[in-house]
């Protein structure tokens, strides 16, 4: 019997985490926790007060914690979406300590401009707004952390998601810190973003 799995679905804003996870996540009953969706749902339900945004964040965080606790108790697989920017290893380390295998699915975009464009399209369709400076910060931080922490995951798949209305292209697989398949060197924009991975 295999260990339960944590699947981290990572990438910058607009990379397609929510749109494509159903195509890319291994077949299971696991529905990835979408923090942004929970936040937006709570935000819209709250009355307009000064601390409305913070309250919505607190409620979304509570939702995440509750679902994680339930997964731990039942030893079920768990998945969540993240920009992989702030404390990216906090939850993976917690799951590892609980005996979970760590899987990372990372979606790449070839520019910050494309990320901003997709955020604006999402806003036009009822999604949440993210300021340009925050999109840029998350873009670089996500790649920096991928380059830094990739060896701590048991299994990683990296995808290129810049093409419009197409399922992302598989670029690399990493198993226990060892690159077993890679076309990363074909993508010039990745050269300075994940140099450690490309050199493997």
Residue ranges of model-derived segments:
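Phosphate-binding P-loop
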Residues: 1-3, 71-72
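Short hydrophobic/aromatic beta-strand immediately N-terminal to the Walker A/P-loop
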Residues: 6-8
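The conserved Walker
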Residues: 12-13
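Conserved glycine(s) of the Walker
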Residues: 16
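Glycine-rich phosphate-binding loop used to anchor ATP phosphates in small-molecule kinases
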Residues: 56-106, 142
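A glycine- and Lys/Arg-enriched "phosphate-lid" helix/loop adjacent to the NTP-binding pocket
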Residues: 100-146
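NTP-dependent small-molecule kinase module
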Residues: 149-200
């Amino acid at each position: 019997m295999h260990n339960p799995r944590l699947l981290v679905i990572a990438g910058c804003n607009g990379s397609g985490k929510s749109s494509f996870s159903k195509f890319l996540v291994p077949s299971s009953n696991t529905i990835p926790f979408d923090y942004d969706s929970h936040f937006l749902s709570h935000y819209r339900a709250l009355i307009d007060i000064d601390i409305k945004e913070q309250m919505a964040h607190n409620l979304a965080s509570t939702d995440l914690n509750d679902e994680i606790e339930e997964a731990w108790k039942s030893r079920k697989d768990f998945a969540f979406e993240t920009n992989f920017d702030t404390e990216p290893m906090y939850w993976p380390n917690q799951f590892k300590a609980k005996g979970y295998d760590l899987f990372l699915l990372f979606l790449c975009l070839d520019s910050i401009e494309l990320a901003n464009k997709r955020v604006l399209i999402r806003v036009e369709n009822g999604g949440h707004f993210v300021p340009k400076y925050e999109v840029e910060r998350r873009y670089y931080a996500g790649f920096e952390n991928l380059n830094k922490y990739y060896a701590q995951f048991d299994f990683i798949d990296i995808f290129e998601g810049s093409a419009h209305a197409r399922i992302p292209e598989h670029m690399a697989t990493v198993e226990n810190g060892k690159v077993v398949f890679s076309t990363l060197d074909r993508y010039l924009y990745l050269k300075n973003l994940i140099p450690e991975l490309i050199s493997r």
